[in-house]
Amino acid sequence: MPKQFAAHRSDKRIPMEVAVLLSGHKVTPGIESTFTENVSARGARVVSVRRWDTNDRLTLASRAGDFRATGRVAYCQSLRETGYAVGVEFLEPDGQWVIQSLSDPFRQ
């Protein structure tokens, strides 16, 4: 049986707390005010009180600045007594995120 290998990240994760707003939960509508645990140019690990399903679509917006993105839930892991860690892949980012991709032509 052939071995399967997980795809490797092209962007490094940086431990950073960024205040964000999450919305788009299918079961529990509304906006959740929360924070990231780490970030990259193409996504973030976010703490949530809600359990999300893999491939759910959500909207993430930074509380400071103009960043907003439609995202895909890559994973949702249970955290002890504090909710869930949600891996978010940015699908349609708009505005200035805290870190830019090395391939971003507008990067300074």
Model-derived features with residue positions:
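Structured alpha-helical
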Residues: 1-108
